[in-house]
């Protein structure tokens, strides 16, 4: 009885082994696994440079600096008067 059950199992296992790997399990890609990471780094670098250039060329930093300076000056004057 054992031999009768083990023969079909053996045939199925042999057919699976001889069939070969599935297409998704084919030979692994031999390219550098860090290519995707390198591309991500370059994209991030380019976007960061563009963002910094856009900020430095805009008027926003100057306006913010003027606003902070003016607010600080007012607070300083108010503290001098109260003292």
From Swiss-Prot:
Segment forming the signal sequence: 1-26
Protein name per Swiss-Prot or TrEMBL: Apolipoprotein C-I, acidic form
GO cellular component, one term: high-density lipoprotein particle
Gene Ontology biological process terms in this record: lipid transport; lipoprotein metabolic process; negative regulation of cholesterol transport; negative regulation of lipid catabolic process; negative regulation of very-low-density lipoprotein particle clearance; triglyceride metabolic process; very-low-density lipoprotein particle clearance
Protein's organism: Pongo abelii
Reported function: Inhibitor of lipoprotein binding to the low density lipoprotein (LDL) receptor, LDL receptor-related protein, and very low density lipoprotein (VLDL) receptor. Associates with high density lipoproteins (HDL) and the triacylglycerol-rich lipoproteins in the plasma and makes up about 10% of the protein of the VLDL and 2% of that of HDL. Appears to interfere directly with fatty acid uptake and is also the major plasma inhibitor of cholesteryl ester transfer protein (CETP). Binds free fatty acids and reduces their intracellular esterification.
Record's subcellular location: Secreted
InterPro entries: ApoC-1_sf (IPR043081), ApoC-I (IPR006781)
Keywords, in A-Z order: Lipid transport, Secreted, Signal, Transport
Disulfide bonds: none
Pfam families (UniProt xref): ApoC-I (PF04691)
Recorded family membership: Belongs to the apolipoprotein C1 family.
Keyword Transport: yes
GO function terms (MF aspect): fatty acid binding; phospholipase inhibitor activity
Gene3D superfamilies per record: Apolipoprotein C-I (4.10.260.30)
Other facts noted in the record for this chain: Apolipoprotein C-I is present in acidic (APOC1A) and basic (APOC1B) forms in P.paniscus, P.abelii and P.troglodytes and perhaps also in baboons and macaques. The two genes for ApoC-I arose through a duplication process that occurred after the divergence of New World monkeys from the human lineage. In human, the acidic form has become a pseudogene sometime between the divergence of bonobos and chimpanzees from the human lineage and the appearance of the Denisovans. Pseudogenization resulted when the codon for the penultimate amino acid in the signal sequence was changed to a stop codon.
Top-level taxonomic group: Eukaryota
Keyword Signal recorded: yes
């Amino acid at each position: 009885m054992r031999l009768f059950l083990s023969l079909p199992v053996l045939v199925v296992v042999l057919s699976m082994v001889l069939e070969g790997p599935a297409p998704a399990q084919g030979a692994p890609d031999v390219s550098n696994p860090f290519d995707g990471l390198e591309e991500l780094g370059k994209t991030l670098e380019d976007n960061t440079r563009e963002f910094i250039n856009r900020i430095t060329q805009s008027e926003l930093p100057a306006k913010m600096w003027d606003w902070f300076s003016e607010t600080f000056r007012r607070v300083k004057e108010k503290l001098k008067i109260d003292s």
